[in-house]
Regions:
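Histidine-centered nuclease catalytic patch
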Residues: 115-160
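Mixed-charge, low-complexity interaction segments
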Residues: 1-82
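Short, charged surface segments at domain edges that flank catalytic/cofactor-binding sites
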Residues: 59-121
Length: 197
């Protein structure tokens, strides 16, 4: 999907943050989403050491790299997806139109599901997690359809996922993880470990 140029994305990024505040989204949650979208994770060992740097300031060979424009688009997309969670606050039409233009579809409250486990995600849980964080843990993560993709932090490869879903997927593509789960369930039945009677 084509997105606006960098200057327009910056304007829309600021408009999105203003819309979030107007919808009653707590500042700590806005900062949390901004950190996930714009900054690298903490990786203090190994080949690609990072610690919350702006994604566009690190080497493009780093798996956590994203252009500034892509990182800001991802922020807008993640926020738009959040308004499809159960219990998400209502959005005024003007703000809704902004988020929908980046999502490429209409926002339908209460319809968002984790792409692997198909569990519904809940705004209150996301909000509470941001307001009362536990070091090293968050209930919802940014997931990647293909975590092995050379440039993985791009708008069409990013979505909200549960922490468990991210753990199960690991370094598999979403499709590979789904097939793996089906095979796993099949083995349980084959070995008599499950019976649905």
């Amino acid at each position: 999907m084509p997105y606006p140029d960098r200057e327009q994305v910056r304007l829309d990024f600021n408009a999105a943050k203003k819309a979030l505040r107007a919808a009653g989204v707590p500042p700590k949650l806005i900062i949390s989403i901004e950190t996930k979208a714009l900054r690298t994770g903490r990786k203090l060992t190994g080949e690609h050491v990072t610690n919350r740097q702006s994604r566009w300031t690190i080497s493009p060979t780093n798996p956590q790299y994203a252009s500034e424009c892509d990182a800001r688009v991802i922020f807008i997309i993640l926020c738009g997806m959040m308004f499809e969670f159960d219990n998400a606050p209502a959005l005024p039409q003007e703000a809704k139109s902004l988020f929908e233009s980046y999502l490429g579809k209409s926002i339908e409250p209460g319809t968002y599901r984790d792409a692997l486990l198909l569990e519904k995600l809940d705004y209150y849980r996301l909000r509470d997690d941001a307001l009362n964080p536990q070091h090293g843990y968050s209930i919802y993560h940014i997931g990647h359809q293909d975590p092995t993709r050379a440039r993985r932090h791009v708008p069409n490869n990013v979505a909200w996922r549960t922490s468990r879903s991210n753990l199960i997927q690991g370094n598999m593509t979403l499709r590979e993880a789904r097939i793996y789960l089906i095979k796993l369930i099949g083995r349980y039945f084959e070995l008599g470990e499950l019976d649905i009677k």
